[in-house]
Amino acid sequence: MIEINQLQKNFGEKKAVDIEKYSIYQGDMLGLVGNNGAGKTTLFRLILDLLQADLGNVTINDIDVSKNEDWKQFTGAFIDDGFLIDYLTPEEYFYFIGKMYGLKKEEVDERLVPFERFMNGEVMGQKKLIRNYSAGNKQKIGIISAMLHYPQLLILDEPFNFLDPSSQS
């Protein structure tokens, strides 16, 4: 469960996030819709402790994200391609992410099988660095890496950006 309490973030005079109290329960699926600059990505970055709040806090399963990192073991996220290590190949990157979660190479390979259709033969085995992939294929690599360890909590910011229509189903 995610609990947001008195959460505020300002950039100069602009209030980007101002949430008094909000709870997201296990099993909930939530989508945020808003104009550019409305604070959606800022909220995700606050939840993931990538930005420091001006006021308030976020807890995930009763763990204050700004004070303890235990929540990271059961959380997967992809916000943008800045999350990717672009001097690796996708295979190297997936193995790196897997290793962070205690997965062996064989386990990573097994967990990639369900994503083969999503990758559409365009990601694996191409012998090129992530930086040389299209924005859509970088998006696929990020989404897959966020899901690789079967997280309890998954946070994706604009997951359909750059994806071909056939990849969105």
Question: Language-model features: where?
Answer:
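A short, proline-enriched helix->beta-strand linker immediately N-terminal to the Walker B motif
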Residues: L148-Q152
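Catalytic Walker B motif of ABC-type/P-loop ATPase nucleotide-binding domains
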Residues: L154-E158
